[in-house]
């Protein structure tokens, strides 16, 4: 498929490729073909040094995370896998979200696990001000989490 070729060729020229499967699914019905999914996944797994899987606490995202984690357990993957939980809410409910996330991904023995909090106030302020998180709220939880990940990745 042309999309798989594009991704494979791009992988030689860039450090990161981010693919939103939700957008791909709805943008081109022909991409729902199982052969395309298999070719796509095989191509990504062959060239990726690091594979980051993003998931939110939402039901659809949690289901997809369980499915992909199960599929990965049956495959040989060259790169390191990092799982990232996004939109974790603070407090007891957030602890429950994180616990569910960890119960799904921990058996896979990933390279790293990351958690990004839900920080609507900071994101809304940055959006409204058309600024970056650092400028809108330098002490926000999301900005601090992103800074910690960036620091870890650059050391």
Which residue stretches match the model-derived regions?
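C-terminal interaction surface of TIR/SEFIR-family domains
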Residues: 139-141
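Nucleotide-state-sensitive switch-loop elements of NTP-binding domains
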Residues: 1
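C-terminal alpha-helix
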Residues: 145-155
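Conserved catalytic-core segment of NTP-binding enzymes
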Residues: 5, 9-111
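Beta-strand-loop-alpha "switch" segments that mediate conformational coupling across diverse proteins
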Residues: 87-92, 103-134, 146
């Amino acid at each position: 498929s042309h999309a798989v070729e594009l991704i494979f060729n791009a992988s030689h020229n860039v450090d990161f490729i981010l693919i939103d499967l939700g957008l791909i699914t709805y943008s081109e019905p022909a991409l729902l073909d199982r052969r395309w999914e298999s070719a796509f996944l095989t191509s990504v797994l062959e060239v990726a040094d690091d594979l980051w899987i993003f998931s939110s606490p939402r039901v659809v995202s949690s289901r997809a995370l369980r499915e992909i984690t199960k599929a990965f357990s049956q495959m040989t993957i060259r790169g390191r896998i990092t799982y990232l939980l996004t939109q974790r809410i603070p407090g007891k409910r957030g602890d429950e979200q994180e616990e569910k996330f960890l119960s799904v991904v921990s058996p896979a023995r990933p390279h790293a696990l990351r958690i990004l909090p839900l920080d609507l106030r900071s994101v809304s302020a940055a959006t409204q001000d058309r600024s970056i998180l650092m400028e809108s709220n330098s002490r926000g939880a999301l900005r601090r989490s992103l800074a910690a990940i960036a620091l870890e990745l650059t050391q």
